[in-house]
Amino acid sequence: KSKNYRAIWISDIHLGSSGAQAEHLLEFLRYNDSNYLYLVGDIIDGWSLTKRWYWPQSHNDVIQKILRKARKGTKITFIPGNHDEGARTFLGITFGDIEIKNETFHKTARNEKLWVIHGDLFDEVMQHARWLAYIGDSAYTFLLWLNKWFNRIRRLMNLPYWSLSQFLKLKVKKAVSIINAFETLMVREASRRGCDGVVCGHIHK
């Protein structure tokens, strides 16, 4: 039986890359509905697709499921990230009942105002050392590939899914300090906009 929520936020799915967990997302979308659905960037991995075309049926099914939700009345907002930044060309346009925006604001049931943005525009590496971001992306893609095979072995042993890439990232002191600095910056920016909180993606946490 489906559960219904006021709002659901999804980010950093990276459809078009072999590391995308499309089947898990599809399962989630089947059994969870909402009045508002925010796609908070990096839904499609344009960087990966330009290197190698990868688009299995499960990735197509996710897109179709999202479009179906929009047709059935879910108010969907797509906020592009750095991996699907090509969509920023269409800001302000509604595509298949999905509104494309650079950022938006969500009012909670408790009347709290949340700032919703992907976050890459506030990432120093993305803005000033883009080449470094591409190198980091290649390393992360390899980690996701490793993660996939690692979890296949875990499934054979009847063990639950466990994110190796997330574990390693949180164990590296430098990565932790960068993540903490990013989170502090985003909270400060949200406050500057008169918001009670921020919902963002980008750092995969």
Pin down the residues of each PLM region.
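Charge-rich, low-complexity amphipathic helices
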Residues: 32, 51, 88-92, 153-157, ...
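A sequence-composition feature that detects small, non-aromatic residues
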Residues: 7, 20-22, 70, 87, ...
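Active-site-proximal loop/helix segment associated with metal-binding centers of metalloenzymes
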Residues: 117-182
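N-terminal short leaders/motifs
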Residues: 46-70, 154-155, 164-176, 189-198
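Conserved beta-sheet core of the metallophosphoesterase superfamily
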Residues: 96-103, 111, 115, 120, ...
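Core catalytic region of metal-dependent phosphoesterases/phosphodiesterases
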Residues: 3-6, 10, 15-110
